[in-house]
Amino acid sequence: MGVTKKPDLNDPVLRAKLAKGMGHNYYGEPAWPNDLLYIFPVVILGTIACNVGLAVLEPSMIGEPPDPFATPLEILPEWYFFPVFQILRTVPNKLLGVLLMVSVPAGLLTVPFLENVNKFQNPFRRPVATTVFLIGTAVALWLGIGATLPIDKSLTLGLF
């Protein structure tokens, strides 16, 4: 790969081109009409065709039909509520469980302010926010997987 030199902004020819609007925004194909009239409809119709084809060729049931006369031993919430359900299930004091549930969105609201001085977008240059995100993701996965297990195996995930 060759070494490219930076453009000289004092060059009058370059300044004239930039003044005409021939800078970095002035290359390539325009989005209208090429993308919006030709490519997008093909992608949308292809996606619809794939979904319809899969629905016709491989119809799958949503789940087993419910039996109103037999309730399960433990009723589980939707999958996106598994971590907070696990918090409520394992904490002995219900008030503490509710406070822990409230602390989840409160903690998420504080993440942008942890490194608000740091203007980098690269996650490797934002170590505090990246660490908080990775630990939060690991805890959410641990709680979510634990919510699907019986209560005696939920904290250790059945590994110990």
Swiss-Prot record:
Gene Ontology molecular-function annotations: electron transporter, transferring electrons within cytochrome b6/f complex of photosystem II activity; electron transporter, transferring electrons within the cyclic electron transport pathway of photosynthesis activity; oxidoreductase activity
Superkingdom, taxonomy of origin: Eukaryota
Regions crossing the membrane: 36-56, 95-115, 131-151
GO cellular component: chloroplast thylakoid membrane
Location of this chain's protein in the cell: Plastid, Chloroplast thylakoid membrane
Membrane-topology annotation of the record: Multi-pass membrane protein
CDD domains from the UniProt entry: cytochrome_b_C
Keywords: Chloroplast, Electron transport, Membrane, Photosynthesis, Plastid, Thylakoid, Transmembrane, Transmembrane helix, Transport
A GO BP annotation: photosynthetic electron transport chain
Family: Belongs to the cytochrome b family. PetD subfamily.
Record text on subunit structure and interactions: The 4 large subunits of the cytochrome b6-f complex are cytochrome b6, subunit IV (17 kDa polypeptide, petD), cytochrome f and the Rieske protein, while the 4 small subunits are petG, petL, petM and petN. The complex functions as a dimer.
NCBIfam families: cytb6_f_IV (TIGR01156)
Physiological role: Component of the cytochrome b6-f complex, which mediates electron transfer between photosystem II (PSII) and photosystem I (PSI), cyclic electron flow around PSI, and state transitions.
Record-linked PANTHER family: CYTOCHROME B
Protein's name according to its UniProt entry: Cytochrome b6-f complex subunit 4
Protein source organism: Solanum tuberosum
Lineage: Eukaryota, Viridiplantae, Streptophyta, Embryophyta, Tracheophyta
